[in-house]
Regions:
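N-terminal accessory targeting/assembly segments
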Residues: 18-123, 127-132
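Active-site phosphate-binding and catalytic loops of NTP-dependent enzymes
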Residues: 32, 74-77, 112-116, 131-137, ...
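Flexible glycine-/small-residue-rich
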Residues: 46-48, 56, 69, 82, ...
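Phosphate-interacting basic helix/loop segments used at nucleotide- and nucleic-acid interfaces
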Residues: 24-29, 108, 164-169, 256, ...
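Short, glycine/charged-enriched hinge/interface segments at domain edges or termini
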Residues: 96-194, 199
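P-loop NTPase catalytic core
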Residues: 171-172, 178-469
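Low-acidity, Ser/Thr- and Arg-rich intrinsically disordered low-complexity segments
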Residues: 8-11
Length: 469
């Protein structure tokens, strides 16, 4: 009688016809429907490109669904990404294999979540938060991958320095706990190496690192060469390589953010590093176009420009802890005004620009200090530190303006005291800005080195300093 009622319910709701029952495992199908006689299942009707279209089930945007292959040998998880009239548009988390018209779709009636806890430290996870080595990890809670940012009025004001152990950043572009900084650079200028230095040298309690759309060979290189055992011990790595489906690459960024949110809620100071925000946006472009969104600027659909602030605003201060966000942005063709770069720069609390020209001079890290800014620095450092940083930037700007004249021998020493002082100090400035990847400095030592360079500045101002010819 129960089986007859279920079959009647299925036929009445036009989900799976009685004569289609031979194409699936009836026992499996009945076990799904016995949970609730009124739960509608869906049926796949079309697969085009990245999307699967189905009639039913009842679902909401971002709901997690499970799709069963026709012979019931495989299960595929997918997410609701849109609707076509009354039909449901799904995007799979894995390669579509064995799924075809008539495959059953079950709504899990919950969004994607990630398991969290201290047991995930030191491990590498995939885009959905599963350990890549198949090991069983100890979890204490689950956090939703999609979450709202903290209420603006609940955020603590950024007031404390987060030392990152890189002199050029700590000295001239000081980052505060809860700040969000973009690292803007073209390809091959040293973004990943700089992230590795931050991860090893930072004073943050926890590192959460997301590698989005990276080459497969670079993942192990980053773990063993850039991060090292010291950095990995207090880190969680979330990896979605370039061959993964767009939805996985998109979710990996949000999974890493959810993990960082968990540790922030435990009162920790978290450093969230994402490489790269550009590839997250590219994944969202694939999802948006596959869902039928129109392309606008440079082929990016509107959802790209709405998803980016949703992701970035989740970082920052809360009333419990902090997430300091470092997001690399791959600058297309070294054009710093292209849409993704421009949008990210407008949302973030500052940016660090890496210069290909400096890299070609073997000046690493290749940070162009004069093109970079930390919008929170003036609020978190003392007056003397701010003054010394300003003097160094002034020396660099003065030297850059006169560099061509100096190089061709057209500048006559003594004709401009500011240029003379810049020439006198430029070697010390460059030495301060350059740093080996295995070098580590305390914040107090960095500030002391910065002050020592300009210990004679007052003598220069009053004219008593004798500059070397």
């Amino acid at each position: 009688a129960a089986q007859a009622d279920v079959t009647s319910m299925i036929r009445t709701n036009c989900i799976v016809k009685e004569d289609d029952m031979s194409s699936i495992n009836k026992n499996k199908y009945l076990s799904l429907t016995e949970k609730s006689f009124y739960k509608k299942l869906g049926k796949v009707t079309k697969i085009v490109g990245l999307t699967i279209e189905s009639v039913g089930p009842d679902a909401k945007l971002n709901d997690l669904c499970r799709i069963y292959s026709a012979d019931n040998s495989q299960e595929l998880y997918a997410e609701v990404v849109g609707f076509n009239d009354s039909n449901v548009l799904l995007m799979p988390y894995d390669v579509v294999d064995g799924i075809g018209p008539g495959s059953v779709v079950e709504n899990m009636e919950r969004p994607l979540s990630v398991k969290v806890g201290d047991g995930i430290l030191g491990h590498t996870l995939d885009g959905l938060g599963n350990p890549t080595d198949g090991s069983e990890l100890e979890y204490t809670d689950e956090y939703p991958v999609e979450a709202a940012p903290p209420d603006p009025m609940d955020r603590e004001i950024i007031s404390k320095v987060l030392p990152l152990g890189v002199k050029a950043v700590d000295g001239l572009l000081t980052v505060g706990k809860g700040q969000r900084i973009g690292i803007f650079a073209g390809s091959g200028v040293g973004k990943s190496t700089l992230l590795g230095m931050f991860a090893r040298n930072t004073k943050a309690d926890i590192n959460v690192i997301a590698l989005i759309g990276e080459r497969g060979r670079e993942v192990r290189e980053f773990v063993e060469r850039d991060l090292g055992p010291e950095g990995m011990a207090r880190s969680v790595l979330v990896v979605a390589t370039s061959d993964k489906p767009a939805l996985i690459r998109n979710k990996a960024a949000k999974t890493a953010t959810a993990i960082a949110e968990y540790f922030r809620d435990q009162g920790k100071d978290v450093l969230l590093m994402m490489d790269s925000l550009t590839r997250f946006s590219m994944a969202q472009r694939e999802i948006g176009l596959a869902s039928g969104e129109p392309p606008v600027t440079r082929g990016y659909p509107p959802s790209v420009y709405s998803e980016m602030p949703k992701l970035l605003e989740r970082a920052g201060m809360s009333d419990k802890g902090s997430i300091t966000g470092l997001y690399t942005v791959l600058v297309d063709g070294d054009d710093f005004n292209e849409p993704i770069t421009d949008t990210a720069r407008s949302i973030l609390d500052g940016h660090i620009v890496l210069s290909r020209k400096l890299g070609q001079k073997n000046h690493y890290p290749a940070i162009d200090v004069l093109q970079s800014i930390s919008r929170c620095m003036s609020q978190i450092v003392d007056k003397k530190h701010k003054q010394m940083a300003g003097r160094m930037k002034n020396v660099m700007a003065t030297y850059n303006e006169a560099e061509d004249l100096i190089n061709i021998g057209a500048y006559k020493s003594g004709s401009n005291r500011n240029i003379d002082y810049a020439i006198y100090k430029i070697d010390a400035v460059n030495k301060f800005l350059m740093q080996q990847t295995d070098e580590k400095f305390d914040f107090e030592d960095e500030v002391t080195q910065l002050s020592d360079i300009f210990a004679d500045y007052e003598a220069f101002e009053n004219g008593s300093l004798q500059l070397k010819k």
